[in-house]
A protein has these predicted regions:
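Alpha-helical packing segments of well-folded alpha/beta enzyme cores
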Residues: 15, 81, 316-326
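Short aromatic-enriched loop/helix-cap "lid" or pocket-rim segments at secondary-structure transitions
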Residues: 44-49, 227-231, 264-267
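Hydrophobic "anchor" residues on beta-strands that sit immediately upstream
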Residues: 181, 215-216, 252
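Conserved core of the PLP fold type I
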Residues: 67-212, 223-246
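Conserved core segment of the aminotransferase class I/II
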Residues: 99, 240-321
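Walker B catalytic acidic pair
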Residues: 220
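N-terminal "arm"/small-domain region of PLP-dependent enzymes with the aminotransferase-like
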Residues: 2-76, 86-87
């Protein structure tokens, strides 16, 4: 087909008429399509409907430790839900804080806390002349909206099939003390679906930040979201790798059940070092007495354990797989 610049007036008018007829044909179908990305379909949402029946007015509402989920307490989440999400994120329970329905909310709070109170005793970012974040591109627009909102300068980092350009990441992180963080989606990263290579993960863990308050924001949103159960991507555990490299406090890992149970009505968590957990506790216990523990209990009783989560994800995969194989 010729480019529009090469077409004559008659050819352009003919093409315009043809396209208008095609448009009218599609318009006549009366379709109402929601093109928003990241929203599970109705058949996927139906998979979790039995969860709404596992707790009712006659249910025992106590945790395994005997705490009443209807009341205040358990600022870091009920123990069994912390264990469930720890297993999902492949970390230790003591490193996990279970929050509300949104991991994005935790990320926002984590940046806001760093702006207002600093990071583990460092100077609050709001008092610094310049704060920069590295942003692998293409990436998640909602990550970038958070840093944009707080006036943080964003630096694009190119991506390839192995993940971010680590030569560039190391150059910025190891030499510029105004670089305070980097956004990462290490597994099945949108929109390309790439997973970070083992080498990339280990190079992240072995960074030597010029800034003592530099943090990796590791959004492991798709950690169990495999299309094929027998063949799927695996990555080294970033918390373990950072600890081995002598950088135990350098990473915040985020996760949720938003694409597992109900988007907007799931449970979310942050996993990080014990030192970071303690710093977060000092602020979070002022901010909130406890999140929705009834929803946490509901998720635990529905999924029961990590095997229940994985079996549920296989049902999602069965719905989605034909779309990838079409």
């Amino acid at each position: 087909m010729k480019s529009y610049m090469q077409m004559s007036r008659e050819e352009l008018l003919s093409l315009k008429a043809s396209l208008e007829e095609e448009f009218k044909t599609e318009e006549a179908k009366g379709l109402s399509l929601n093109m928003a990305r990241g929203k599970p379909g109705a058949s996927q949402l139906a998979l979790s409907m039995p969860m709404l029946d596992v707790i009712n007015s006659k249910s025992d509402m106590k945790t395994l430790l005997g705490n009443d989920t209807r009341n205040y307490g358990d600022w870091d989440g009920i123990g069994e839900c912390r264990q469930l999400l720890a297993d999902m994120m492949e970390v230790k329970k003591d490193n996990v804080i279970v929050c509300g329905n949104s991991s994005l909310n935790i990320m926002y709070d984590t940046v806001a806390r760093s702006m207002i109170r600093g990071v583990n005793g460092s100077t609050p970012w709001c008092k610094l002349d310049k704060v920069k974040f590295l942003c692998p591109v293409p990436g998640y627009d909602r990550h970038f909206k958070i840093t944009e909102l707080f006036g943080i300068e964003m630096i694009n980092i190119p991506m390839d099939e192995n993940g971010p350009d680590m030569d560039l990441v190391e150059k910025y992180v190891n030499n510029d003390e105004t670089v305070k963080g980097i956004w990462c989606v290490p597994k099945y990263s949108n929109p390309t679906g790439i997973t970070y290579s083992d080498e990339v993960v280990k190079r992240f863990a072995n960074l030597h930040p010029k800034a003592e308050d530099f943090r990796i924001f590791w959004d492991n949103a798709y950690c169990i979201h495999h299309i094929y159960d027998e063949i799927h991507d695996k990555i080294p555990n970033i918390l373990e790798e950072c600890e081995k490299a002598g950088n135990p406090d350098m990473v915040y890992m985020f996760g949720s059940t938003s694409k597992v149970s109900f988007p907007g009505s799931g449970v979310s968590a942050i996993a990080t070092s014990l030192a970071n957990v303690e710093f977060i506790r000092q602020h979070m216990t002022v901010q909130i007495i406890g999140h929705d523990k009834i929803n946490q209990l509901r998720h635990v009783r529905f999924f029961k354990d990590i095997d229940g989560l994985k079996n549920h994800m296989q049902k999602h995969a069965e719905i989605l797989r034909p779309k990838f194989e079409a």
